Amino acid sequence: MTIAKIRCRLFIMKDKIIDAAIRRVPDFPKKGILFYDITGILVNPEVFSYCLDKMTEMYKDKKVDAVAAIEARGFIFAAPFAYKMGIPLILIRKKGKLPGETYSASYDLEYGQASVEVHKTDVVKGQKVLLLDDLIATGGTLNAARSILEEGGAKVVGFCGVVGLPFLNYSKVLGDLPVKTLIEYDSEKI
């Protein structure tokens, strides 16, 4: 086994605090999908705080001007993260939820299709933006969010998630930008 594979296996070893809070729900939202439910983190203030502290530690020395969050669960982690980092929060919403002029993009999900949009006024040209979501699966949502931010002139500098599912190959979709997660799972098996 190579050093890279050993490091990968060690990284995929679960953070026990976070792992204990994540519930696995088989066949949701459709048959054959194992859903990693992060609500156990939210009902436990100590685990939620632990996650925010880990995220802040990962990015405290990085050049990030703003964080953009994916609706809806990404908002939950991004708002306190933005506050702790002292940076603005940009909301990436589902299509049809924003009243002003928007940038919009469609994408494929692990289990369907959707569109996201952002207010044009919220995107600042040249701003270095970190994209944050609760879970990174195929990377489709984050890639669509990146495209609308870049359309407005922002520079996406990385992706962050609470949970990562690298076996769904999100790195191929997200390209060469850094992807950081607090915990990763290597399959959809219980």
From Swiss-Prot:
Q: Does the keyword Cytoplasm apply?
A: yes
Q: Cite a single GO MF annotation.
A: adenine phosphoribosyltransferase activity
Q: Report the GO terms under cellular component.
A: cytoplasm
Question: Pfam families in the record, alphabetically?
Answer: Pribosyltran (PF00156)
Which keywords does this chain's UniProt record carry?
A: Cytoplasm, Glycosyltransferase, Purine salvage, Transferase
Which reaction is this enzyme known to catalyze? AMP + diphosphate = 5-phospho-alpha-D-ribose 1-diphosphate + adenine
Q: Report the locations given in the UniProt record.
A: Cytoplasm
Annotated HAMAP family: Aden_phosphoribosyltr (MF_00004)
**What does the subunit comment say?**
Homodimer.
UniProt name for this protein: Adenine phosphoribosyltransferase
Organism for this UniProt entry: Treponema denticola (strain ATCC 35405 / DSM 14222 / CIP 103919 / JCM 8153 / KCTC 15104)
Q: Which gene encodes it?
A: apt
